[in-house]
UniProtKB/Swiss-Prot annotation:
Disulfide cysteine pairs (residue numbers): none
The family this protein is said to belong to: Belongs to the delta endotoxin family.
Protein name: Pesticidal crystal protein Cry2Aa
Any GO molecular function: signaling receptor binding
Source organism of the structure: Bacillus thuringiensis subsp. kurstaki
Note: Toxic segment of the protein is located in the N-terminus.
Length: 633
């Protein structure tokens, strides 16, 4: 144990945070409710070109990974994507993507894609019917297995998937490819889980286990590479950059991040994957490229392990009469300085001006775990009354689950809300970000003021960014404002995102690294003998603890829980990995051993890493897997 982590700080939960709320609200929702919420979202809430079915599918897959009920995912997935055999929802996804990217398939390619959609849904429907007939036979004699149908369906998937990877349209077709990959990987998982009931031989079962690993690798790498190629070509305003990322996360990476977890069963995924939203006001004209993204990303993520309570800042409203004695006036509302506040008295650095007294405070009012923020308004613009009077407005407003609102100014314009997502962090940028900041990403929990270059007209202004994710199984706040993770009451497995640590030593050499295939981002250690501590509220169950790590070089992992130390030496994932290249990380899931999450107790979990080769180490996921449900590969 590092002395840094034994510096006298004790873990005490804030009593006011332990209130009646449902930390497993997503798991308790029915699929019908989820579908209705996404339909309502599309109807009333968002201008983003996203078909609501994409949100329903990601929620469905997360619920299936977290459940033992129903082993035939493909049958249910077909009903969601192709209701009554219709391809309309898949065509909706394509039309929405065409509008968002301002690109269209040519006539011949569109006809080809539509024909593939019709063929794909018909193939899956026929396969599902064959399985139904096998399980409820009307013919005699009853076939001993359905292997022939399984192998035929496998080949049909292999024939059809390339039709959604057409040269010149890879990005445009990526959301359709992701849905087709969802169905293919669900099919393979179904074969593995139903092998006994379907009469699948041991040899065929081994083949399909290999298929699950190999096609998870291939499809993940294709999606990541296609997205990154497009992202590297961006040179645009922050709003447009974040909107592109959010669009691709909803349509593609919500699925990619689940695929690598398909090998687990009954694993409740506590996601740390974020959606970002910002305003589209005309004042923010600074352009950003992919080279600037590491800094921006670190700014938005730096305090993700704290429990958000609100913001404070300086809002100004100034009216100037028109010059020369002409009638009319110009009124300007602006947020000129902002600070993000968290439980435990923790605050971020200042955004915008650093020398102004704050004159407003926006908080959840009620305990932040009970009533977190879920919606933001971040736009700005200009209203004109006639030809002589104008008002430059700005919003920076937020709403809780109880519809309580607060902010710098009144809510107006487009709102940012996603079903089952909470605003777990708020960040922001000044009018212009200094070059010296753009080249220096923030380290873990760094407090740094972010301001415009001296002398920039309007440089005092701040523009906020809301950070949305699904993380909800939070028991309480530690004394230092970080989250205590809550284990499920039953024997369901669960995950902890590594970025949601209680505390970390060597912070100046620890960074959050963006990941796409992992249900959240990694904690990157660049200094040896670094320890990350996590706190969880136990349930008394025994689990196999798996750590998803990337170690390009030899490392030693020491895990301490309940006074017991587990050591794994010579960890090197350079070649021994799952094959996915996730933004430079090549990961493998390491079985640390059997642990017990003590019942009704705050349990500390310390993960210490020694870098024997001096190379960076990514801690990508912490998984508590039921002992009776080993991974499928």
């Amino acid at each position: 144990m590092n002395n840094v982590l034994n510096s006298g700080r004790t873990t005490i939960c804030d009593a006011y945070n332990v209130v009646a709320h449902d930390p497993f609200s997503f798991e308790h929702k029915s699929l019908d409710t989820i579908q209705k919420e996404w339909m309502e979202w599309k109807r009333t809430d968002h201008s983003l070109y996203v078909a609501p079915v994409v949100g329903t599918v990601s929620s469905f897959l997360l619920k299936k990974v977290g459940s033992l009920i129903g082993k035939r995912i493909l049958s249910e997935l077909w009903g969601i994507i192709f209701p009554s055999g219709s391809t309309n929802l898949m065509q909706d996804i394509l039309r929405e993507t065409e509008q968002f990217l301002n690109q269209r398939l040519n006539t011949d390619t569109l006809a080809r894609v539509n024909a593939e959609l019709i063929g794909l849904q018909a193939n899956i429907r026929e396969f599902n019917q064959q399985v139904d007939n096998f399980l409820n036979p009307t013919q005699n004699p009853v076939p001993l297995s359905i292997t022939s149908s399984v192998n035929t369906m496998q080949q049909l998937f292999l024939n059809r998937l390339p039709q959604f990877q057409i040269q010149g349209y890879q990005l445009l077709l990526l959301p359709l490819f992701a849905q087709a990959a969802n169905m293919h990987l669900s099919f393979i998982r179904d074969v593995i889980l139903n092998a006994d009931e379907w009469g699948i031989s041991a040899a065929t079962l081994r083949t399909y286990r290999d298929y699950l690993r190999n096609y998870t690798r291939d499809y993940s790498n294709y999606c990541i590479n296609t997205y990154q190629t497009a992202f590297r070509g961006l040179n645009t305003r922050l709003h447009d950059m974040l909107e592109f990322r959010t669009y691709m996360f909803l349509n593609v990476f919500e699925y990619v991040s689940i695929w690598s977890l398909f090998k687990y069963q009954s694993l409740m995924v506590s996601s740390g994957a974020n959606l970002y939203a910002s305003g589209s006001g005309p004042q923010q004209t600074q352009s950003f490229t992919a080279q600037n993204w590491p800094f921006l990303y670190s700014l938005f993520q730096v305090n993700s392990n704290y429990i958000l309570s609100g913001i404070s800042g300086t809002r100004l409203s100034i009216t100037f009469p028109n010059i020369g004695g002409l009638p009319g006036s110009t009124t300007t509302h602006s947020l000129n300085s902002a600070r993000v506040n968290y439980s435990g008295g923790v605050s971020s650095g200042l955004i915008g001006a650093t020398n102004l007294n704050h004159n407003f405070n926006c908080s959840t009012v009620l305990p932040p775990l009970s009533t977190p923020f879920v919606r933001s308004w971040l736009d700005s613009g200009t209203d004109r009354e006639g030809v002589a009077t104008s008002t430059n407005w700005q919003t920076e407003s937020f709403q809780t689950t109880l519809s309580l609102r607060c902010g710098a100014f009144s809510a107006r314009g487009n709102s940012n809300y996603f079903p089952d997502y909470f605003i777990r962090n708020i960040s922001g940028v000044p009018l212009v970000i200094r070059n010296e900041d753009l080249t220096r990403p923030l380290h873990y929990n760094q407090i740094r003021n972010i301001e415009s270059p001296s002398g920039t007209p309007g440089g005092a202004r701040a523009y906020l960014v809301s950070v949305h994710n699904r993380k909800n199984n939070i028991y309480a706040a530690n004394e230092n404002g970080t989250m205590i993770h809550l284990a499920p009451e039953d024997y369901t497995g669960f995950t902890i995102s590594p970025i949601h640590a209680t505390q970390v030593n060597n912070q100046t050499r620890t960074f959050i690294s963006e990941k796409f295939g992992n249900q959240g981002d990694s904690l990157r250690f660049e200094q040896s003998n670094t320890t990350a501590r996590y706190t969880l509220r136990g349930n008394g169950n025994s689990y196999n603890l798996y750590l998803r790590v990337s170690s390009i070089g030899n490392s030693t992992i020491r895990v301490t829980i309940n006074g017991r130390v587990y050591t794994v030496s010579n960890v090197n994932t350079t070649t021994n990995n799952d094959g996915v290249n996730d933004n430079g990380a090549r990961f493998s899931d390491i079985n640390i051993g059997n642990i017990v999450a003590s019942d009704n107790t705050n349990v500390t979990l310390d993960i210490n890493v020694t870098l024997n080769s001096g190379t960076p180490f990514d801690l990508m996921n912490i998984m508590f897997v039921p002992t009776n449900l080993p991974p499928l590969y």
